[in-house]
Amino acid sequence: MTIIRKKHPLIKIINHSFIDLPAPSNISSWWNFGSLLGLCLIIQILTGLFLAMHYTSDTSTAFSSVAHICRDVNYGWLIRYMHANGASMFFICLFLHVGRGIYYGSYNMIETWNMGIILLFAVMATAFMGYVLPWGQMSFWGATVITNLLSAIPYIGTTLVEWIWGGFSVDKATLTRFFAFHFILPFIITALVLVHLLFLHETGSNNPTGLNSDADKIPFHPYYTIKDFLGVLVLLMAFMILVLFFPDILGDPDNYTPANPLNTPPHIKPEWYFLFAYAILRSIPNKLGGVLALILSILILALMPLLHTSKQRALTFRPITQTMYWILVADLLILTWIGGQPVEYPFIMIGQAASIAYFAIIVIFMPIAGMIENNILDLD
């Protein structure tokens, strides 16, 4: 068996990636989220595949087909709620994974980090298009509002929006193409994940100290396969509690009303995992400015390697930057809350303050904190 594992051209790749991979001996549970994201992706592809067997991407039957899946298909309700809540688990793992990367300075592995940002954009695009498919009120109006943002692009904006819509409003053509893209994107994401792993295995994993761990490596299997399996059990437990006991807690009640272009819901808002970006978008009165801020709220992650001023990699031994980091986390929670609130006083002011704080902490305060720590520790 050892010979096959090490010699066979295909199994050899798996061996070098998941079995004999040299891993730092001290990586904590924060390093579990990569494998958990892989699990989430597999769950989403499998449940999505079974949903696609029964779903029809036509405006007149889309809503009914989802109801049919829940009522008439064997375990259709389970597959549907696993898919809907699987997206939430996916984003929880994603945010924790990115947060870990920022805390421990993993962004210094630039190729891996940039690939991760591309993956984040791809997953967000997939989730947005998936939310449109049930063709409820929030599906329709969410699609209308978000795609309409592209009209802010000078000169080509309106033409671009009508091209994406396939007409003069969100209609049958839009739903059909969103279904097509929603189906294909997870497979593209899977390919990007392999590239992400390829780049990671060029440098090896980071570790909680941020120091070089070449002198102290252990094989991935059995140590981290067992450790990851514990994470898998915890995730599946939380996931199934969510799916079986509180399946609608993260959804919007408006989406149980079929899409009606003549009736606008009182508060149009996306799923909870987009609320922080939605709050940043809404906090700028200008349409184009809002769109740019929305894109920058994620794209700013690409600047993190350039904004790294400290002589140390991780925040483990850097209390000032640690404080900035946790203020940033609190700020993102505030933005998430604001994104779900109506556009009125005092929420507008809080949203604008939190949006300014978000960019200021990343671009100004964290780099300055790094320089101060260098001086304190006399690392210049």
Swiss-Prot record:
Gene3D superfamilies given in the database record: Cytochrome Bc1 Complex, Chain C
Keyword Membrane attached: yes
Cofactor section: heme b
Subunit structure, as described in the record: The cytochrome bc1 complex contains 11 subunits: 3 respiratory subunits (MT-CYB, CYC1 and UQCRFS1), 2 core proteins (UQCRC1 and UQCRC2) and 6 low-molecular weight proteins (UQCRH/QCR6, UQCRB/QCR7, UQCRQ/QCR8, UQCR10/QCR9, UQCR11/QCR10 and a cleavage product of UQCRFS1). This cytochrome bc1 complex then forms a dimer.
Membrane-protein topology: Multi-pass membrane protein
Similarity annotation: Belongs to the cytochrome b family.
Gene name, Swiss-Prot/TrEMBL: MT-CYB
Protein's name according to its UniProt entry: Cytochrome b
GO molecular function annotation: metal ion binding; ubiquinol-cytochrome-c reductase activity
Keywords: Electron transport, Heme, Iron, Membrane, Metal-binding, Mitochondrion, Mitochondrion inner membrane, Respiratory chain, Transmembrane, Transmembrane helix, Transport, Ubiquinone
Subcellular location: Mitochondrion inner membrane
Keyword Nucleotide-binding included in the entry's annotation: no
Functional note: Component of the ubiquinol-cytochrome c reductase complex (complex III or cytochrome b-c1 complex) that is part of the mitochondrial respiratory chain. The b-c1 complex mediates electron transfer from ubiquinol to cytochrome c. Contributes to the generation of a proton gradient across the mitochondrial membrane that is then used for ATP synthesis.
Cofactor notes: Binds 2 heme b groups non-covalently.
Organism classification: Eukaryota, Metazoa, Chordata, Craniata, Vertebrata
TM regions (residue ranges): 33-53, 77-98, 113-133, 178-198, 226-246, 288-308, 320-340, 347-367
Listed InterPro entries: Cyt_b/b6_C, Cyt_b/b6_C_sf, Cyt_b/b6_N, Cytb/b6-like_sf, Cytochrome_b, Cytochrome_b_C_euk/bac, Cytochrome_b_N_euk/bac, Di-haem_cyt_TM
Other observations noted: Heme 1 (or BL or b562) is low-potential and absorbs at about 562 nm, and heme 2 (or BH or b566) is high-potential and absorbs at about 566 nm.
